Swiss-Prot record:
ATP binds at G42, V43, T44, G45, S46, G47, K48, T49. Residues 29-414 form the Helicase ATP-binding domain. HAMAP family: UvrB. A motif (Beta-hairpin) lies at residues 95-118. The lineage of its organism: Bacteria, Pseudomonadati, Pseudomonadota, Gammaproteobacteria, Pasteurellales. It comes from Haemophilus ducreyi (strain 35000HP / ATCC 700724). It comes from the Bacteria. SUPFAM superfamilies: C-terminal UvrC-binding domain of UvrB (SSF46600), P-loop containing nucleoside triphosphate hydrolases (SSF52540). PROSITE patterns: HELICASE_ATP_BIND_1, HELICASE_CTER, UVR. This is UvrABC system protein B.
Amino acid sequence: MSKPGKPFILNSPFAPSGDQPSAIKKLTEGLQDGLAHQTLLGVTGSGKTFTIANVIAQLNRPAMLLAPNKTLAAQLYAEMKAFFPENAVEYFVSYYDYYQPEAYVPASDTFIEKDASINEQIEQMRLSATKSFLERRDTIVVASVSAIYGLGDVNAYMQMMLHLQVGAIINQRDILARLAELQYTRNDQAFQRSTFRVRGEVIDIFPAESDEIALRIELFDDEIDNLSLFDPLTGHSFGKIPRYTIYPKTHYVTPRERILTAIDQIKNELTGRQDYFIKEHKLLEEQRITQRTQFDIEMINELGYCSGIENYSRYLSGRQEGEPPPTLFDYMPADGLLIIDESHVTVPQIGGMYRGDRARKETLVQYGFRLPSALDNRPLKFEEFERLSPQTIYVSATPGNYELEKSNGDIIDQVVRPTGLLDPIIEVRPVASQVDDVLSEIQQRVALDERVLITTLTKKMAEDLTDYLDEHGVRVRYLHSDIDTVERVEIIHDLRIGMFDVLVGINLLREGLDMPEVALVAILDADKEGFLRSESSLIQTIGRAARNLNGKAILYADRITHSMQKAITETERRREKQQKYNQEHNIIPQALNKKVRELLDIGQTDKQKKGKQAVKIAEQSASYTPNAPKSRQALEKELKQLTQQMQKLAKDLEFEKAAAVRDKIGQLKMALLEV
């Protein structure tokens, strides 16, 4: 398949500065010299993403960015999208909103059926990501660790594509039959993703990987007379095109010949398994495996797929036992780049995925719920991941031993920030008075309209501290592990816009999310050596205050542990280097005024997005801005108007919009107190 050689066009009003130019130069030269592994030690707020964007643009090679979770992947995706608006920036994370894998608990003889809720928007983005890798050189895919999980075989996927060209001889029935093979469904009433409709000699197709473009095929007898793209909502035509390729609805489609071969192989394995269970006098297990597998075979034969078809992926992709599954890496061009963000977290995650998955499946196989071949439906083993990985850049403020070893200890330092901001000042204070001391510090910060993060060791302490601060009039929220990804981003968004001032957490305030408004990080019980108070954890947590001009970290401890000493020494090293650079170049540190980006519409339905847009319109109509000086009379008048607007929206059952107006009222009341 020919791929257009469109270059990456980096869109940024800023030129690289601070340590960025030397980091870009070293990384680019290293990749050109064929280095397989490089490590970028980039401190918080040093513009690591911008450095990577420059490297990609200079080398003009497709890239995959791996992030440790969906939240950071969404943030990276938003940033890369802004840097490369003219190129293909894609998003590839797990498409499950909810996922309960099938499992068997022998102790209670409980079988748990697979139960999942698939997010259609993210499924579309995943299909778009693989399409871009197959079609375009100017592609950046931002992925989570989902990238190491099994995906449909790339060769079978490409074999199933439907290529259409103006002037091609093909009759309507053949096109419809091919669409059915691609698992598209006919729906002449509701035109949505992965469906087609037929009107006379016109076929409209809504591609599975698209969210805003549909294809119209106009036939004349058995010849394609016209191909055109149009807006599926309005019907507005985007113009005629000479050719178009329809991609399958799912990555798991398989040609008919391969399906028939796979069915024979599944039957052979089933026979062997039946003999084994009968020989072992396990008649219940023999009955289970026979019943389940025969039902699946029937479904695959009739429809081309069945529930849990991924458990037969070894046969459907034509692999041998123990071979690595096809993954996103198989769709990636051979000269692609791999960038692992927050590598000190992401790399160990990749290593742990295979073992957890294997333990669950072995139980299913042992008790007759799955054939042994189901064990090959798995994520990549760590050594397979290493073997498949192209040239790799590890990015972290605290690289782990693995990254240092792979890079032969040669680290590219990006410590100096373009803004001239310094690493936070660190103070160590006694544990005995930590709660009262934190309260006093909070009051000082709130008076300056700054935010505070507090990290504790236990859930109980976090809850008690939150209650205590709340009783003392502090606007505080508690971020715990039960909060889902979307709500977590919303809480951090609310902290940034000033809906509350203090966020308390345990292990959720470390990597990644930009919060320039946070001026103080308080680490309680910093001298309790362990996972949450390790050197890298402390450096990452301290780094949350590094984007603020007045950044400060207070470590409450009665003794200086080995981890604390190393974290303090490293922070002081960075601070010294930053100060020296600022003096040499006459740089005055500047506050980082980073826009509060909306990450939350990734993976939301059109209906949810429209609701959010309507909320934004409601916000714009309220002329109140927190920093605009207004008289008390004007504020009271506006408060009255907004209250009426909120009541009307609530009466009309427009609760999302009403909640947005309610938040405005809260800000307005705070402004009134200050007048």
